[in-house]
Amino acid sequence: SGLLSLIKQGVTVAEIRRPAEPNAFFLDSPVQEQYEWAEDLLNRTHFNDTGVTVCILDTGVNSDHKLISPYMPTSCATVNSSWGTRDKYGHGTNMAGVVLYNDLKRHLITDVPFELNHTVESVKILEPNSPTEATLYGAVTQQAISLSEIYNPTAKHIYCMAITDPTSGLNNGQPSSWSAAIDQISSEGQKKLFIVSAGNVEEDELTMDGYPDACLNKSIEDPAQAWNALTVGAYSLDTDIQPCRETAGYSPLAQSGELSPYSSTSNGWKSQWPIKPEVVCDGGNVASDGKNLISGMDELSKLTLSKDINRRLFDTIWATSAATAQCSYLSAELMAVYPSMKPETVRALIVHSARWTTQMINQFGFPDTKNIGRKNLLRTCGYGVPNLEIAKDTLNNRVNMIIEGELQPYEKKGSSTKMKEMHIHTLPWPESVLQTLENTMVKVRVTLSYFIEPGPGQKGWKNKYRYPSSGLRFDIKRPNETIEQFQQRINKLMRDDNYQRGSSINNNWYLGSKNRDVGSIHSDVWEDTAINLAQSGVLAVYPVVGWWRERTTLKKYNSKLPYSLVVTIETPDENVDLYTPIMTKIASKVTVPIITSDDT
């Protein structure tokens, strides 16, 4: 009636939105009404069979759930037949609800058709009443992957695991037998995308250290330090608490857009170890009255599906589990759009699309320097919140270029093993458009993703150059630098393990090589005037030392390393057309492999 009165008075109403329903509206509804909500959503869901499936490694999934069964084509599996496949704990079914529907509440309250482009699978790897020995976690995970491939050999798999070990004692980023198993699974044979939760900050840690210090002090949990895994932390969106007697005096710890109080970080790690988490998704919030905390509050959590289908269809999920399920949904949707895309590329695009919220920058990003604020942002929030639209779509003024390549990092010559290849990518660059923009600031975002093979036998795992099989790096041609000069500079970077770049080289990179050149995915933004960038449409991908080169007795020095390179050029003016000139050049040869000379 108030809105109608405003309209009658001639007040312009820009937009009318239905108020957000609290989670309790669905959770507390009679079960028959919940079935009606589910039936309505089911009738509006259009399923496209793309062959993409997310395999959930968890406590099992209730495949009889009305909103799961149509999209779970294979039987549930388990690594231990004595456990059965039933989800007694509920966590796996909670995960499945988000993996399938992402924002379930939004789909329930609208009447808009819902497009679903992937299915789910379940391999039970955890039975709370029958714990597995920690030394077997890696073997159990490998067994689960084998089962999924046996049950569904033709599927395009994404693996989702929101199970970590808070008791491992590993809190410094070093590899473990479990994280190395994930790296091995990802890199061997048919490459695999593994999405892992960062691990959670517990209530007692928040009580002791406060927020956000508890997040800064809590290390990423094993096995989320795995180099090849896409590790997911959490940020907070919801801040509305429904008033009632139990919540009187409580308010959310985090503001909307800030790091979630649940999210662990790599803030305390030495700089040699990977950036973890790489991205953050919505993991809910924690409520506080100044003395007491409430975690898992319904209104500060994400609506999902319940295992107890006879009592209720809906439930809530929170923390890095919820975030990991969301990232799995985004990755599956991306793979469904580009079915031939390699797992390394899907990971690259998720990271490439991520952006920090303003609240994250205000929370951790000052002073705004490479050594402090930007480093802190990376080590707490990763590269930010992934955006599916940015990942999959190109606009006139923001064009994504994707290159999937493979190079041989090393070769044996005589008694020594040396660097062999680098790749120089001459991009389909819109020089003429950039020249007309003159001093307009333009951004070039570059992401390089590849999967390393972990060093066998745990030998040298404390050394970042001895754990990975090989590392790759990227660099951009500077303005006024010839191709020959650029090649010579990259050759020197390849030849000398201790070579330090001059400080002037890094000035235009937002993060800089010291921050980004760790792990097996590297992303950065180069910002410069358009006239300068017009001369910089050449990128190099080159190798650095790894155990394939150092451990010659294993005879891996002739191995090849696939990689994915994503480059985006973007102008602030939406009316600038970069897309057309790039497309006219796209048929030209993009990659020129260059073999280094004998003295390298």
What are these regions, as identified by a protein language model?
Residues 1-43:
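Autoinhibitory propeptides
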Residues 42-75, 82-136, 189-191, 225-229, ...:
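Subtilisin-like serine protease catalytic core
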Residues 59-80, 235-252, 259-324:
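Catalytic-core environment of secreted peptidases
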Residues 126-228, 236-239, 311-318, 322-324:
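Substrate-binding/access-modulating region of protease and related hydrolase catalytic domains
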Residues 323-337:
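Short, small-residue alpha-helix embedded
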Residues 343-344, 352, 356, 381, ...:
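Hard-cation-handling environments
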Residues 371-468, 472:
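Secreted peptidase-domain scaffold signal
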Residues 441-600:
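Long mid-to-C-terminal assembly/interaction modules of large eukaryotic proteins
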